[in-house]
């Protein structure tokens, strides 16, 4: 019985920690980590090099024309 109660308490604590991070912030972190477009400012992750946003994905930036390929 003690084990079940402990498990329920631990589950509730983990769930509350997961809910502490807003969904949009979590998505922004995820997009930034994989090099996609950051939803808030529509820019690519700076570490991905010269790239620009096209929808939700980053594409190579044409240096000469300054627009997405």
UniProtKB/Swiss-Prot annotation:
Keyword terms: Amidation, Disulfide bond, Knottin, Neurotoxin, Secreted, Signal, Toxin
GO molecular function, one term: toxin activity
CC per GO annotation: extracellular region
Tissue and organ expression note: Expressed by the venom gland.
A Pfam cross-reference name: Toxin_7
Keyword Signal: yes
Domain of life from the UniProt record: Eukaryota
Main location: secreted
Record-annotated disulphide pairs: 37-53, 44-58, 52-68
Residues that make up the propeptide removed upon maturation: 21-34
Compartmental location: Secreted
Known role: Insect active toxin causing rapid but reversible paralysis in crickets. No activity shown in mammals. Does not show effect on mammalian voltage-gated calcium channels.
Description of its domains: The presence of a 'disulfide through disulfide knot' structurally defines this protein as a knottin.
Family as reported in the entry's similarity comment: Belongs to the neurotoxin 01 (U2-agtx) family.
Name recorded for this polypeptide: U2-agatoxin-Ao1z
Organism expressing this protein natively: Agelena orientalis (Funnel-web spider)
Phylogenetic classification of the source organism: Eukaryota, Metazoa, Ecdysozoa, Arthropoda, Chelicerata
């Amino acid at each position: 019985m003690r084990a079940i109660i402990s498990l329920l308490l631990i589950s509730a604590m983990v769930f509350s920690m997961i809910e502490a991070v807003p969904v949009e912030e979590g998505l922004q972190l995820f997009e930034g980590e994989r090099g996609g477009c950051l939803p808030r400012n529509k820019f690519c992750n700076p570490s991905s090099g010269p790239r620009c946003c096209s929808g939700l994905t980053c594409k190579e930036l044409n240096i000469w024309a300054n627009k997405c390929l």
